């Protein structure tokens, strides 16, 4: 059994965080070695509320929760949380997603085990990719499952698109060694973006370009497992540093 640590980044949105964790608890079917949450709100009130809430949501896991005393930005928070990981795989998660189908980690392993240059597998629906194009050719992988012993996974590779190789901080499985190949993320980002950028897309693009230069790519399943629920409650990214 390949060990997986969940790393979840949050920023004070406890209502969305609760929905995210509850849906993960309901639909995840793979054993989790550790569950790490790092909150970057810098808000003591949020920290006090989370201290009361999270032990119940995470009672089934060996869990660790960290609060930044003042905001550091998502990227520094990710680098810190990843530095605490001692498992070969990370399931990255943010605080504004809702899962609705099972076996997303097992199915991701089926693809990643067969392709060492697959940086991650997207779990969104095909019509929910922010217009990121995919290859027309589809691929099939059979897998055993109790309810579907002859089931087939259909997926597509994502095309390189305006510098994007497919890397994203959206929910998804990734190898710890692939992170360590370029770690920390902050060294690949312009200084103006490291603390608290106005657009996280710029950060993802810079990291995606780096992985693309190393030959990595991403894939997406024909059927999705998760939806974004945070559009109307986006974190206001203003530095307090």
Question: Where do the protein language model's features map onto the residues?
Answer:
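Short, well-formed alpha-helical segments that are part of the catalytic scaffolds
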Residues: 13-27
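Short beta-strand-to-loop element that shapes/binds the nucleotide-sugar donor at the catalytic cleft/hinge
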Residues: 121-137
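Glycine-rich, basic loop-to-helix element that forms the pyrophosphate-binding segment
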Residues: 69-84
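Acidic donor-binding segment of Leloir-type glycosyltransferases
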Residues: 25-65
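Short beta-strand-to-loop acidic/aromatic patch adjacent to the donor-nucleotide binding site
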Residues: 88-98
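C-terminal catalytic/acceptor-binding lobe
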Residues: 19, 164-241
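Cell-envelope/extracellular polymer assembly enzymes that use nucleotide-activated donors
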Residues: 3-5, 34
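Conserved donor-nucleotide/metal-binding helix-loop-beta segment in metal-dependent transferases, i.e.
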Residues: 102-123
């Amino acid at each position: 059994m390949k060990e997986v640590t969940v790393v979840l980044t949050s920023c004070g949105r406890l209502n969305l965080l609760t929905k995210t964790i509850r849906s993960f608890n309901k639909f995840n079917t793979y054993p989790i070695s550790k569950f790490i949450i790092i909150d970057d709100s810098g808000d003591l009130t949020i920290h006090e509320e989370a201290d009361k809430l999270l032990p119940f949501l995470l009672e089934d896991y060996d869990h660790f929760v960290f609060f930044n005393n003042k905001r550091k930005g998502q990227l520094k928070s990710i680098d810190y949380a990843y530095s605490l990981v001692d498992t070969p795989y990370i399931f990255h998660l943010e605080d504004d997603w809702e899962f609705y189908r099972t076996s997303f980690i097992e199915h991701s392993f089926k693809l990643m085990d067969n392709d060492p240059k697959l940086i991650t597998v997207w779990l969104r629906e095909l019509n929910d990719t922010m217009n990121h194009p995919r290859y027309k050719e589809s691929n099939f992988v059979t897998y055993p499952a109790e309810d579907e012993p002859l089931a087939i996974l259909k997926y597509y590779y994502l095309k390189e698109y305006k510098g994007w190789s497919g890397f994203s901080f959206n929910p998804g499985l990734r190898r710890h060694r692939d992170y360590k190949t370029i770690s920390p993320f902050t060294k690949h980002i312009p200084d103006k973006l490291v603390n608290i950028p106005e657009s996280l897309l710029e950060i993802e693009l810079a990291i995606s370009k780096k992985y693309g230069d190393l030959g990595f790519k991403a894939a997406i399943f024909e059927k999705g497992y998760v939806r974004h629920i945070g559009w109307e409650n986006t974190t206001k990214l203003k530095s307090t540093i």
